[in-house]
Each structure stands twice: as C-alpha cells, then as structure tokens.
C-alpha cells in the first residue's frame, strides 16, 4: 500500500541514513492520490526534512574547525533537506508522463501542471515555518542549466523546465511571505550519477521566431505559465503547506 511504502522510505532515511534520493518519490503523492495518502506523504516529508537538517547541522559541527569554509558549505549542502530538490527535478524529468517539448510549450504549459503540483508539494513542506533552505534551493535551480542529464543527455530539456518551474515556486513563495532569499555562500556539488557539469548555460527557445535564444532564469519556462496551488494537506502541526 502507499502508506506502507511511505513508511519504509521515511524509516530508511531517518533511522538508517539513506540519502535524499529516497525522499523525492514522496512528492509524487501530491497528484492522483487521496487526501489520506497526501497527508501521510506530507507528514513523512516533514519528518525526513527535520532529520536531514539535524544531519547537516551535525556535519557542520563535526568539521567546522578542520574544514575550509567553502568546502564545508559545499559538502554540508549534500547532507541537507533542500538537496532533495535536485533529485525530484531529475525524477520528474524521467517521468513517463512528462510531455514532449512541443506539447509542454503549448497552451501556456498546462501539460506541466501535475509536475508543478508535485514540485509545490515538496517545496511547501520543505519551507514550512522556515526560510533557511531558500538561498541554496534557489541557487541549485538557477544553476541546473549548467548541467546535463548524466544518464541521457536528450532528457536534459526536462531538467531545465522542471528547474524553472521549481524556481518560480520558490520565488513566488518568498514574495508571498516577505522572505529575503539571500545568497548561498558556496558552490554546488552535483551528484555525478545524475548530473554532468557543462561550461555554458543551456539556452531556451526564443520568445519569437528569429529572436535571440532565452538564457538564464526561466529560459525554459513555457510562455504564460502560471502556478496553481498544490493540494497540500494539513501536517502534524495543523498548518497547511503553501506552494
């Protein structure tokens, strides 16, 4: 059952130190599942993120006096809750229902709506009551276009679209809550099994025929794309996550 699988993933991460890769699939519960399953997944993610934050804090404390600050920031990020987000982007880019490039770009990107809701579900839980993750999460999503898919370069477009949607979710949330996003003081260390660095940022399709390619944040976001709230159920503290 979904609840049993959710429980196993939560237990594996919080009790046995499994990496964030195993947390990303829980966001898929945001779409096509009943409210009980969504709540179970949201509560599990909240528990997982709390555990990961402790893990990252313990790592920092352990190596603060022996590790260079830049290396410490980069390495501690790989232990953090927000490091789940790149894995979810990768997972969604490989999702069998991800629309083609042409279908996704049509009708203001409506075909990406379920994927946005899954990203919103994760981000809403990740930022519940805290803005600590925003600088690193935003930087990772912004720099995703300096990578290609390490397993299949032809799927890289999906990475860029998902990262742009996640970036939109993060920035809109920060605006709604009046949070300063700040700058993450370190480089990003990408999991090499999933992402391969490249020298230049990937370019998106021009806004009009014959125009210059789009570059930078939102370069791959469908024109006219707007966010729709995810069905984020109440968590254990009684508050709803907001996308």
Predicted regions and their residues:
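Residue-level signature of alpha-solenoid helical repeat scaffolds
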Residues: 7-11, 24, 28, 43-47, ...
């Amino acid at each position: 059952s979904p609840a049993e699988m959710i429980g196993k993933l939560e237990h594996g991460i919080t009790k046995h130190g499994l990496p964030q890769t195993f947390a990303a699939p829980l966001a898929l519960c945001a779409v096509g599942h009943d409210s009980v399953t969504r709540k179970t997944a949201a509560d599990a993610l909240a528990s997982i993120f709390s555990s990961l934050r402790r893990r990252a804090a313990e790592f920092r404390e352990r190596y603060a006096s022996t590790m260079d600050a830049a290396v410490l920031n980069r390495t501690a990020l790989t232990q953090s809750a927000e490091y789940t987000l790149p894995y979810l982007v990768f997972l969604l880019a490989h999702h069998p229902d991800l629309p083609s490039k042409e279908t996704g770009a049509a009708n203001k990107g409506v075909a990406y709506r379920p994927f946005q809701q899954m990203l919103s579900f994760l981000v809403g839980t990740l930022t519940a009551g805290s803005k600590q993750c925003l600088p690193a999460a935003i930087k990772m999503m912004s720099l995703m276009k300096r990578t290609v898919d390490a397993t299949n370069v032809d799927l890289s477009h999906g990475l860029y679209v998902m990262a742009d949607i996640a970036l939109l979710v993060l920035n809109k949330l920060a605006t709604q809550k009046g949070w300063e996003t700040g700058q993450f003081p370190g480089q990003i260390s990408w999991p090499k099994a999933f992402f391969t660095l490249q020298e230049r940022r990937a370019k998106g399709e021009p806004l009009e025929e014959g125009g210059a390619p789009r570059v930078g944040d939102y370069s791959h976001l469908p024109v006219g794309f707007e966010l729709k709230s995810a069905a984020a159920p109440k968590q254990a503290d009684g508050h709803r996550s907001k996308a």
